[in-house]
Amino acid sequence: MRMQLTAVLAASLLAGCQNQAFREIGQAPSMSPIGSGLQYTQAPQLAAYPKQPHQMTAGYSLWNDQQAALFKDARAINVGDILTVDIQIDDKASFNNETDRSRTNSSGFNLGASGESQTSDFEWSGNLKYGSNIKTEGDGKTERSEKLRLLVAAVVTGVLENGNLLISGSQEVRVNHELRILNVAGIVRPRDVDADNIISYDRIAEARISYGGRGRLMEVQQPPWGQQVVDLVSPI
């Protein structure tokens, strides 16, 4: 048992020493290499999307149906093209759930017997009673308010067979040893990209938007890794 505990502690210490925060002591958080965010981490199920119908030959025409705009600038439709994602999130939600359950149960059983013989008299009686009372009360309330306004450039990383685009983009800003990271990925239709080559976040299917940070402030807000391990394995 002692050896197992020692092994667990050693593994925890090793994991803690490998933390990136240890390598950044005394210096600002390092930024990711350019191009590291151009990956759609969750591959879509291509079989769920219909294939692009066969198009008629355009002959010698310069018109491109995918652009669908004669007097507007070209929009992103090919792998490597860049478009802008407009993120405007202003959500508020409030949930209030209340549960009250009560049950009472009572059972009784009586038994009696008496008799007489030439040698002795006997009398016997019994009484059994059982009762239970169960009551459960629960009250839960959740309030959430989010407001986010950002613009981020994304790159077309793939084109599905039906013409929809896979996009992925990231943005990192480092201020006073604090690194703010914005990631966005999803599937868009070329027709939803406006004339300014901008698409709203609510028109992105399978959208994956994350906004967070890494640095000294985040380390203070998070509990120590040792406490997280104890909270994970503690049965109480």
UniProtKB/Swiss-Prot annotation:
It comes from the Bacteria. It is a lipid-anchor. Coiled coil: none annotated. GO terms for biological process: bacterial-type flagellum-dependent cell motility. Residues 1-16 form the signal peptide. Transmembrane segments: none annotated. Assembles around the rod to form the L-ring and probably protects the motor/basal body from shearing forces during rotation. This is Flagellar L-ring protein. The gene is flgH.
